[in-house]
Design a protein with these regions (language model features):
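Long, acidic/polar, low-complexity amphipathic helices and coiled-coil-like
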Residues: 51-220
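Short amphipathic beta-strand/extended segments with alternating polar/hydrophobic composition
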Residues: 90-91, 99, 109-114, 168-175, ...
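Hydrophilic extracytoplasmic domains
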Residues: 4-29, 41, 237-377
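Extended amphipathic alpha-helical coiled-coil/heptad-repeat regions
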Residues: 172-176, 183-268, 273-274
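Acidic/polar, low-complexity intrinsically disordered N-terminal segments immediately downstream
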Residues: 1-109, 344-377
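Detector for glycine-centered tight turns/loop "hinges" at secondary-structure junctions
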Residues: 165, 225-226, 344
């Protein structure tokens, strides 16, 4: 496929993609948000409740060491907005609920629930920074240490209903294999998330971390059952227990738009070697020969392709190309992503995806952003 044909295909796909997303799809939610913001004048009861729940998370405070265990299930209760004031109207364990009416007087409810097994997790990276206070009695600084533990529920569900009908849901399911103190070299974490907002659905399937040597993630964004974007990534490597020594090996990543109308596939054979090659290149950015050699090494580690219109043969090869840049007093070398098409033509990313060539899709995107800003301001 030549560059001209590829550009036409991408123009068509980008416009079709933007045409699938309409700001009016979110009009209902903007009205609900506007009602909630305008009517909620006094949330002092909620603030006091939250502080009480937060205080309940403190397990111990000995020898200036404060140990907290944060549990979603600790934050339960039911609140109703009436006359601009939030009032506590219920207290059922395992559920947090907020009731209010929108501008039309339609009852709306936001509910947070948890279920399933709870797993206690802790890692030193969760802990807060040590604080030092001067003790005038002893003339010395006193160190306060904060340790943060979390109780991770197996299932978390957040729901927005209007007139009893679900309009938005977020469901998070997690599976953790740990003894409590997270060991990044041994433990496994797997999380799946599904969020539904009107006709839109975002699914993150099996975002997984496996025994310090493998990371996986996959996600899709769809509307009315049609997949708008699909993404996946997988990486292999190693990590030590403190996460201060990370090695990256093979990495693959794919992104597809409108069921394969446009797809980018990237494979890196060795992440560490790629990082080293790029570091070396930019440490020699005033030496053309050295810079080119290191970028050539980087390209040998990358296999990146652009596929169009659902075809098995790639439309363009994606690679890094050395480009000379000139400043006021000196010149240096930089690497920019380039596309090489079937007709032999080569374009930098910036030269191919110009505002002029994709002005229709860009205008559609800017209008969408502007409309959403007005809706949710």
């Amino acid at each position: 496929m030549g560059a001209s044909e590829a550009k036409q295909s991408l123009q068509k796909t980008s416009e079709a993609f933007m045409g699938k997303i309409n700001s009016q799809d979110f009009n209902e939610f903007s009205k609900i948000w506007a009602s909630l913001s305008a009517e909620s004048n006094d949330g002092s009861i909620v603030d006091e409740w939250f502080d009480t729940c937060l205080d309940a998370c403190l397990l111990s405070s000995r020898n200036n060491t404060y140990k907290y265990l944060y549990k979603v299930s600790n934050f339960y209760g039911e609140f109703t907005l009436n006359g601009g004031v939030w009032k506590k109207t219920g207290s059922s364990k395992g559920m947090l609920r907020f009731n209010f009416n929108d501008k039309e007087g339609t009852p709306c409810t936001i509910t947070l629930t948890t279920s399933g097994k709870e797993t206690q997790i802790h890692h030193e990276s969760f802990d807060g920074y040590d604080e030092y206070d001067y003790n005038y009695g002893t003339g010395e600084y006193q160190k306060d240490t904060y340790q943060n533990y979390y109780m991770l529920p197996e299932n978390i569900s957040l729901t927005l209903t209007k007139s009893g009908k679900e309009r938005m849901t977020v469901v998070v399911n997690s599976k953790v294999s740990t003894s409590g103190e997270i060991n990044l070299t041994k433990d496994e974490v797997e999380v799946t998330t599904t969020a539904t907002v009107g006709d839109y659905k975002i699914s993150v399937g099996k975002a997984a971390f496996k025994k310090g040597n493998e990371v996986q993630a996959a996600a899709t964004i769809s509307k009315g059952g049609e997949t708008l974007i699909a993404m996946s990534a997988e990486g292999k490597g190693s990590i030590n227990e403190k996460a201060d020594n990370i090695s990256v090996g093979q990495v693959t990543a794919n992104m597809s738009v409108l069921d394969g109308k446009a797809t980018v596939k990237v494979a890196v054979s060795d992440g560490d070697l790629l990082s080293k090659a790029l570091d070396n290149a930019y440490n020699n950015d005033e030496n053309e020969k050295s810079f080119r050699n290191y970028i050539a090494t980087a390209n040998s580690l990358i296999n990146a392709k652009l596929y169009l219109d659902g075809k098995n043969d790639y439309a363009a090869n994606i690679y890094l190309s050395p480009v000379e840049k000139k400043d006021y007093y000196y010149s240096y070398w930089d690497a920019e992503p380039f596309l090489e098409f079937g007709d032999g033509s080569k374009f930098s990313y910036a030269d191919f995806f110009t505002e002029k060539s994709f002005n229709t899709a860009i205008d559609m995107f800017e209008r969408l952003v502007s409309d959403l800003e007005v809706m949710f301001q």
